[in-house]
Amino acid sequence: MARFEPYNYNNGHDPFFAHINQNPELINLDLPASTPSSFMLFSNGALVDANHNNSHFFPNLLHGNTRRKGNKEESGSKRRRKRSEEEEAMNGDETQKPKDVVHVRAKRGQATDSHSLAERVRREKINERLKCLQDLVPGCYKAMGMAVMLDVIIDYVRSLQNQIEFLSMKLSAASACYDLNSLDIEPTDIFQGGNIHSAAEMERILRESVGTQPPNFSSTLPF
């Protein structure tokens, strides 16, 4: 092995050359100068071969590199995890979307979601019922407004109820006084006997209940 005599740098200002003077065996000239491993590294005033383990001389550099690598890997894993979560969320939304949407061909200006469709069906049913009521109730028109139209319908129904009650009361009174099916009175008995008052009362009840003129018994009499 060829060795150079240490060059004496006695200036005392450069610790690099002072360390070389104290340790001349660090200089290795056996390796060819053209190879990258023949270069010497300097750390903390000491020359070392690039082929040797430099973890003792560069602990901060190695730890910094590992720390940066760990941070990069951690950030990359976080990004991948976040991207996978976003993709799963998007896939879940795509799978749930066809269940919520009702595929109905709507007209222009009309919505296609289920709530709007149900509301539209309800309004159509209400309009149909109102048209039926307009045909049944006299004096009921859609132009007068919903509230006024409902008031007219209510008044008409109440009037019908009152008429039904009144007619039922008159019919019950007439049936209580006279049983027309079992009435066995001759016309001669009515005018010859004392049943004239009863005949007049029967005519009055029939006129009120039926609304027509009762038959004239005197025209059928022979005298």
UniProtKB/Swiss-Prot annotation:
<dbReference type="GO" id="GO:0005634">
    <property type="term" value="C:nucleus"/>
</dbReference>
<protein>
    <recommendedName>
        <fullName>Transcription factor bHLH75</fullName>
    </recommendedName>
</protein>
<dbReference type="GO" id="GO:0006355">
    <property type="term" value="P:regulation of DNA-templated transcription"/>
</dbReference>
<feature type="domain" description="bHLH">
    <location>
        <begin position="110"/>
        <end position="160"/>
    </location>
</feature>
<dbReference type="InterPro" id="IPR011598">
    <property type="entry name" value="bHLH_dom"/>
</dbReference>
<feature type="region of interest" description="Disordered">
    <location>
        <begin position="58"/>
        <end position="100"/>
    </location>
</feature>
<dbReference type="GO" id="GO:2000488">
    <property type="term" value="P:positive regulation of brassinosteroid biosynthetic process"/>
</dbReference>
<keyword id="KW-0539">Nucleus</keyword>
<comment type="subunit">
    <text>Homodimer.</text>
</comment>
<keyword id="KW-0238">DNA-binding</keyword>
<keyword id="KW-0805">Transcription regulation</keyword>
<dbReference type="GO" id="GO:0003700">
    <property type="term" value="F:DNA-binding transcription factor activity"/>
</dbReference>
<dbReference type="InterPro" id="IPR024097">
    <property type="entry name" value="bHLH_ZIP_TF"/>
</dbReference>
<dbReference type="GO" id="GO:0046983">
    <property type="term" value="F:protein dimerization activity"/>
</dbReference>
<dbReference type="Pfam" id="PF00010">
    <property type="entry name" value="HLH"/>
</dbReference>
<dbReference type="GO" id="GO:0003677">
    <property type="term" value="F:DNA binding"/>
</dbReference>
<dbReference type="InterPro" id="IPR036638">
    <property type="entry name" value="HLH_DNA-bd_sf"/>
</dbReference>
<keyword id="KW-0804">Transcription</keyword>
